[in-house]
Amino acid sequence: MSFSSLPTEIQSLLFLTFLTIYLVTLMGNCLIILVTLADPMLHSPMYFFLRNLSFLEIGFNLVIVPKMLGTLLAQDTTISFLGCATQMYFFFFFGVAECFLLATMAYDRYVAICSPLHYPVIMNQRTRAKLAAASWFPGFPVATVQTTWLFSFPFCGTNKVNHFFCDSPPVLRLVCADTALFEIYAIVGTILVVMIPCLLILCSYTHIAAAILKIPSAKGKNKAFSTCSSHLLVVSLFYISLSLTYFRPKSNNSPEGKKLLSLSYTVMTPMLNPIIYSLRNNEVKNALSRTVSKALALRNCIP
Protein backbone atom coordinates (compact mmCIF):
# COMPACT_ATOMS: atom_id res chain seq x y z
CA MET A 1 0.00 0.00 0.00
CA SER A 2 0.90 3.66 -0.29
CA PHE A 3 2.92 5.02 2.65
CA SER A 4 5.77 2.51 2.94
CA SER A 5 8.27 4.71 1.08
CA LEU A 6 7.86 7.67 3.46
CA PRO A 7 10.23 8.31 6.41
CA THR A 8 9.01 7.06 9.81
CA GLU A 9 8.71 10.63 11.16
CA ILE A 10 6.43 11.63 8.28
CA GLN A 11 4.33 8.50 8.77
CA SER A 12 3.92 9.31 12.48
CA LEU A 13 2.82 12.85 11.63
CA LEU A 14 0.37 11.55 9.03
CA PHE A 15 -1.02 9.07 11.57
CA LEU A 16 -1.76 11.83 14.10
CA THR A 17 -3.25 14.05 11.37
CA PHE A 18 -5.52 11.35 9.93
CA LEU A 19 -6.51 10.11 13.40
CA THR A 20 -7.60 13.65 14.34
CA ILE A 21 -9.55 14.03 11.08
CA TYR A 22 -11.12 10.60 11.58
CA LEU A 23 -12.29 11.39 15.13
CA VAL A 24 -13.62 14.81 14.09
CA THR A 25 -15.49 13.16 11.19
CA LEU A 26 -17.09 10.53 13.43
CA MET A 27 -18.01 13.01 16.17
CA GLY A 28 -19.30 15.64 13.74
CA ASN A 29 -21.49 13.29 11.74
CA CYS A 30 -22.74 11.45 14.84
CA LEU A 31 -23.63 14.82 16.36
CA ILE A 32 -25.62 15.77 13.23
CA ILE A 33 -27.50 12.45 13.41
CA LEU A 34 -28.27 12.79 17.13
CA VAL A 35 -29.33 16.44 16.94
CA THR A 36 -31.60 15.96 13.92
CA LEU A 37 -33.22 12.99 15.67
CA ALA A 38 -33.54 14.61 19.10
CA ASP A 39 -34.76 18.09 18.14
CA PRO A 40 -38.40 18.22 16.92
CA MET A 41 -37.64 21.43 15.00
CA LEU A 42 -35.36 19.43 12.70
CA HIS A 43 -37.86 16.68 11.83
CA SER A 44 -38.22 17.98 8.27
CA PRO A 45 -37.29 16.34 4.94
CA MET A 46 -34.16 18.48 4.60
CA TYR A 47 -32.70 17.13 7.86
CA PHE A 48 -33.89 13.61 7.11
CA PHE A 49 -31.66 13.64 4.02
CA LEU A 50 -28.86 15.36 5.94
CA ARG A 51 -29.04 12.52 8.46
CA ASN A 52 -28.72 10.02 5.59
CA LEU A 53 -25.68 11.93 4.32
CA SER A 54 -24.06 11.74 7.76
CA PHE A 55 -24.66 7.97 7.95
CA LEU A 56 -23.12 7.67 4.48
CA GLU A 57 -20.06 9.77 5.36
CA ILE A 58 -19.42 7.67 8.47
CA GLY A 59 -19.57 4.50 6.35
CA PHE A 60 -17.35 6.01 3.65
CA ASN A 61 -14.78 6.95 6.28
CA LEU A 62 -14.88 3.54 8.01
CA VAL A 63 -14.11 1.78 4.73
CA ILE A 64 -10.79 3.57 4.19
CA VAL A 65 -9.37 5.40 7.21
CA PRO A 66 -9.04 2.61 9.86
CA LYS A 67 -6.95 0.46 7.49
CA MET A 68 -4.89 3.51 6.55
CA LEU A 69 -4.26 4.29 10.24
CA GLY A 70 -3.28 0.67 10.86
CA THR A 71 -0.83 0.85 7.97
CA LEU A 72 0.78 3.99 9.37
CA LEU A 73 0.87 2.80 12.99
CA ALA A 74 1.96 -0.84 12.63
CA GLN A 75 3.95 -0.41 9.39
CA ASP A 76 1.84 -3.28 8.03
CA THR A 77 1.42 -2.41 4.37
CA THR A 78 -0.36 -5.62 3.40
CA ILE A 79 -4.02 -6.26 2.72
CA SER A 80 -5.61 -9.62 1.95
CA PHE A 81 -7.23 -10.40 -1.39
CA LEU A 82 -10.66 -10.58 0.27
CA GLY A 83 -9.95 -7.44 2.30
CA CYS A 84 -9.03 -5.52 -0.85
CA ALA A 85 -12.18 -6.70 -2.66
CA THR A 86 -14.35 -5.81 0.34
CA GLN A 87 -12.82 -2.36 0.65
CA MET A 88 -13.32 -1.69 -3.06
CA TYR A 89 -16.93 -2.91 -2.94
CA PHE A 90 -17.94 -0.58 -0.12
CA PHE A 91 -15.92 2.30 -1.57
CA PHE A 92 -17.98 2.07 -4.77
CA PHE A 93 -21.21 1.51 -2.84
CA PHE A 94 -20.84 4.60 -0.64
CA GLY A 95 -19.37 6.72 -3.45
CA VAL A 96 -22.26 6.01 -5.84
CA ALA A 97 -24.83 6.45 -3.06
CA GLU A 98 -23.36 9.86 -2.19
CA CYS A 99 -23.65 11.06 -5.79
CA PHE A 100 -27.35 10.18 -5.92
CA LEU A 101 -28.09 11.38 -2.37
CA LEU A 102 -26.65 14.81 -3.17
CA ALA A 103 -28.97 14.93 -6.20
CA THR A 104 -31.93 13.98 -3.99
CA MET A 105 -31.02 16.73 -1.52
CA ALA A 106 -30.92 19.23 -4.41
CA TYR A 107 -34.41 18.11 -5.47
CA ASP A 108 -35.61 18.58 -1.89
CA ARG A 109 -34.30 22.18 -1.92
CA TYR A 110 -35.96 22.73 -5.31
CA VAL A 111 -39.36 21.67 -3.95
CA ALA A 112 -38.89 23.73 -0.77
CA ILE A 113 -38.07 26.94 -2.66
CA CYS A 114 -40.14 26.57 -5.83
CA SER A 115 -43.26 25.01 -4.24
CA PRO A 116 -43.16 26.06 -0.56
CA LEU A 117 -46.92 25.71 0.00
CA HIS A 118 -46.99 22.16 -1.37
CA TYR A 119 -43.65 21.14 0.17
CA PRO A 120 -45.06 19.20 3.18
CA VAL A 121 -47.48 17.34 0.90
CA ILE A 122 -44.95 16.52 -1.84
CA MET A 123 -42.13 15.57 0.56
CA ASN A 124 -44.21 13.45 2.92
CA GLN A 125 -42.68 10.60 4.92
CA ARG A 126 -43.40 7.98 2.28
CA THR A 127 -41.91 10.07 -0.54
CA ARG A 128 -38.75 10.94 1.36
CA ALA A 129 -38.26 7.26 2.31
CA LYS A 130 -38.60 6.27 -1.36
CA LEU A 131 -36.15 9.00 -2.43
CA ALA A 132 -33.64 7.91 0.21
CA ALA A 133 -33.95 4.26 -0.88
CA ALA A 134 -33.55 5.29 -4.53
CA SER A 135 -30.36 7.15 -3.56
CA TRP A 136 -28.81 4.25 -1.68
CA PHE A 137 -29.86 1.46 -4.08
CA PRO A 138 -27.67 2.25 -7.16
CA GLY A 139 -24.57 1.59 -5.07
CA PHE A 140 -25.40 -2.13 -4.83
CA PRO A 141 -25.43 -3.10 -8.56
CA VAL A 142 -22.54 -0.77 -9.45
CA ALA A 143 -20.33 -2.05 -6.61
CA THR A 144 -21.28 -5.68 -7.24
CA VAL A 145 -20.59 -5.66 -10.99
CA GLN A 146 -17.41 -3.55 -10.78
CA THR A 147 -15.82 -5.49 -7.92
CA THR A 148 -16.87 -8.99 -9.01
CA TRP A 149 -15.72 -8.42 -12.58
CA LEU A 150 -12.37 -6.90 -11.64
CA PHE A 151 -11.50 -9.58 -9.09
CA SER A 152 -12.45 -12.37 -11.51
CA PHE A 153 -9.35 -11.51 -13.60
CA PRO A 154 -6.07 -13.38 -13.02
CA PHE A 155 -3.37 -11.42 -11.16
CA CYS A 156 0.34 -11.98 -11.68
CA GLY A 157 3.69 -10.26 -11.27
CA THR A 158 3.89 -7.51 -8.67
CA ASN A 159 1.32 -7.45 -5.89
CA LYS A 160 1.86 -3.82 -4.85
CA VAL A 161 -1.20 -1.55 -4.97
CA ASN A 162 0.20 1.94 -5.50
CA HIS A 163 -2.47 3.70 -3.46
CA PHE A 164 -3.61 4.08 0.16
CA PHE A 165 -6.78 2.04 -0.51
CA CYS A 166 -8.01 -0.49 -3.09
CA ASP A 167 -9.34 1.72 -5.86
CA SER A 168 -10.06 0.27 -9.29
CA PRO A 169 -7.26 1.85 -11.43
CA PRO A 170 -4.26 0.80 -9.27
CA VAL A 171 -5.67 -2.73 -8.79
CA LEU A 172 -6.39 -3.00 -12.52
CA ARG A 173 -2.68 -2.46 -13.25
CA LEU A 174 -1.92 -5.78 -11.52
CA VAL A 175 -4.16 -7.79 -13.87
CA CYS A 176 -2.45 -9.99 -16.47
CA ALA A 177 -5.32 -10.35 -18.97
CA ASP A 178 -7.14 -8.33 -21.60
CA THR A 179 -9.16 -5.73 -19.69
CA ALA A 180 -10.28 -3.56 -22.62
CA LEU A 181 -13.99 -4.38 -22.22
CA PHE A 182 -13.84 -3.83 -18.47
CA GLU A 183 -12.10 -0.48 -18.93
CA ILE A 184 -14.80 0.68 -21.39
CA TYR A 185 -17.47 -0.37 -18.88
CA ALA A 186 -15.64 1.37 -16.03
CA ILE A 187 -15.26 4.64 -17.97
CA VAL A 188 -18.86 4.66 -19.22
CA GLY A 189 -20.17 3.62 -15.79
CA THR A 190 -18.18 6.31 -13.98
CA ILE A 191 -19.37 9.00 -16.39
CA LEU A 192 -23.01 7.94 -15.99
CA VAL A 193 -22.82 7.61 -12.20
CA VAL A 194 -21.20 11.02 -11.85
CA MET A 195 -22.94 12.92 -14.65
CA ILE A 196 -26.57 11.82 -14.15
CA PRO A 197 -26.73 13.08 -10.53
CA CYS A 198 -24.68 16.14 -11.52
CA LEU A 199 -27.17 17.03 -14.28
CA LEU A 200 -30.07 16.54 -11.87
CA ILE A 201 -28.36 18.87 -9.39
CA LEU A 202 -27.74 21.49 -12.10
CA CYS A 203 -31.36 21.24 -13.23
CA SER A 204 -32.62 21.69 -9.67
CA TYR A 205 -30.39 24.68 -8.99
CA THR A 206 -31.27 26.31 -12.32
CA HIS A 207 -34.92 26.30 -11.25
CA ILE A 208 -33.94 27.41 -7.73
CA ALA A 209 -31.91 30.35 -9.09
CA ALA A 210 -34.81 31.40 -11.33
CA ALA A 211 -37.22 31.23 -8.38
CA ILE A 212 -34.88 33.24 -6.10
CA LEU A 213 -34.49 35.99 -8.73
CA LYS A 214 -38.27 36.41 -8.77
CA ILE A 215 -38.43 37.09 -5.02
CA PRO A 216 -38.96 40.86 -4.65
CA SER A 217 -37.27 41.52 -1.29
CA ALA A 218 -33.54 41.20 -0.59
CA LYS A 219 -34.34 39.58 2.76
CA GLY A 220 -36.43 36.92 1.03
CA LYS A 221 -33.67 36.23 -1.49
CA ASN A 222 -31.07 35.87 1.28
CA LYS A 223 -33.30 33.52 3.26
CA ALA A 224 -33.99 31.36 0.19
CA PHE A 225 -30.30 31.26 -0.74
CA SER A 226 -29.24 30.39 2.82
CA THR A 227 -31.42 27.26 2.75
CA CYS A 228 -29.37 25.74 -0.07
CA SER A 229 -25.93 27.40 0.27
CA SER A 230 -24.55 24.66 2.57
CA HIS A 231 -25.64 21.91 0.21
CA LEU A 232 -24.25 23.79 -2.79
CA LEU A 233 -20.87 24.11 -1.06
CA VAL A 234 -20.80 20.40 -0.17
CA VAL A 235 -21.73 19.44 -3.76
CA SER A 236 -19.00 21.70 -5.16
CA LEU A 237 -16.30 20.22 -2.90
CA PHE A 238 -17.32 16.64 -3.70
CA TYR A 239 -17.67 16.98 -7.47
CA ILE A 240 -14.59 19.15 -8.01
CA SER A 241 -12.33 16.68 -6.17
CA LEU A 242 -14.02 13.70 -7.86
CA SER A 243 -13.66 15.23 -11.33
CA LEU A 244 -10.01 16.15 -10.80
CA THR A 245 -9.30 12.58 -9.68
CA TYR A 246 -11.10 10.57 -12.38
CA PHE A 247 -11.54 12.88 -15.39
CA ARG A 248 -8.12 14.44 -15.85
CA PRO A 249 -5.96 13.47 -18.87
CA LYS A 250 -3.55 10.63 -18.09
CA SER A 251 -0.60 12.87 -18.96
CA ASN A 252 -1.52 15.14 -16.02
CA ASN A 253 -2.55 12.32 -13.70
CA SER A 254 0.48 11.10 -11.71
CA PRO A 255 -0.10 8.41 -9.05
CA GLU A 256 1.07 10.74 -6.27
CA GLY A 257 -1.21 13.54 -7.44
CA LYS A 258 -4.15 11.16 -7.61
CA LYS A 259 -3.49 10.00 -4.05
CA LEU A 260 -3.62 13.59 -2.79
CA LEU A 261 -6.84 14.28 -4.70
CA SER A 262 -8.35 11.04 -3.42
CA LEU A 263 -7.68 12.21 0.13
CA SER A 264 -9.85 15.26 -0.51
CA TYR A 265 -13.10 13.34 -1.10
CA THR A 266 -12.40 10.22 0.99
CA VAL A 267 -11.01 11.91 4.12
CA MET A 268 -11.48 15.69 4.02
CA THR A 269 -15.02 16.03 2.60
CA PRO A 270 -16.64 13.70 5.19
CA MET A 271 -15.03 15.85 7.91
CA LEU A 272 -16.03 19.18 6.34
CA ASN A 273 -19.68 18.31 5.66
CA PRO A 274 -20.92 18.45 9.29
CA ILE A 275 -18.80 21.56 9.90
CA ILE A 276 -20.33 23.30 6.87
CA TYR A 277 -23.88 22.33 7.81
CA SER A 278 -23.47 23.30 11.48
CA LEU A 279 -21.65 26.61 10.93
CA ARG A 280 -23.70 27.86 7.97
CA ASN A 281 -27.12 26.72 9.16
CA ASN A 282 -28.80 28.69 11.94
CA GLU A 283 -31.39 25.97 12.59
CA VAL A 284 -28.66 23.39 13.22
CA LYS A 285 -26.71 25.83 15.43
CA ASN A 286 -29.83 26.63 17.45
CA ALA A 287 -30.68 22.93 17.74
CA LEU A 288 -27.15 22.21 18.97
CA SER A 289 -27.53 24.92 21.62
CA ARG A 290 -30.89 23.53 22.73
CA THR A 291 -29.52 19.98 22.88
CA VAL A 292 -26.49 21.05 24.92
CA SER A 293 -28.72 23.08 27.27
CA LYS A 294 -31.05 20.10 27.79
CA ALA A 295 -28.08 17.80 28.42
CA LEU A 296 -26.62 20.22 31.00
CA ALA A 297 -30.00 20.68 32.68
CA LEU A 298 -30.48 16.91 32.85
CA ARG A 299 -27.01 16.51 34.31
CA ASN A 300 -27.74 19.11 37.00
CA CYS A 301 -30.98 17.31 37.92
CA ILE A 302 -29.13 14.06 38.59
CA PRO A 303 -27.89 13.99 42.21
Swiss-Prot record:
It comes from the Eukaryota. It is a multi-pass membrane protein. Belongs to the G-protein coupled receptor 1 family. InterPro entries: GPCR_Rhodpsn, GPCR_Rhodpsn_7TM, Olfact_rcpt. Odorant receptor. Residues 1-12, 63-86, 148-184, 246-258 are extracellular. This is Olfactory receptor 10A2. The keyword Iron-sulfur does not apply. The chain crosses the membrane at residues 13-33, 42-62, 87-107, 127-147, 185-204, 225-245, 259-279. It is found in: Cell membrane. Keywords: Cell membrane, Disulfide bond, G-protein coupled receptor, Membrane, Olfaction, Receptor, Sensory transduction, Transducer, Transmembrane, Transmembrane helix. GO terms for molecular function: G protein-coupled receptor activity; olfactory receptor activity. Residues 34-41, 108-126, 205-224, 280-301 are cytoplasmic. Disulfide bonds join 84-176. GO terms for biological process: detection of chemical stimulus involved in sensory perception of smell. One of its GO terms (cellular component) is plasma membrane.
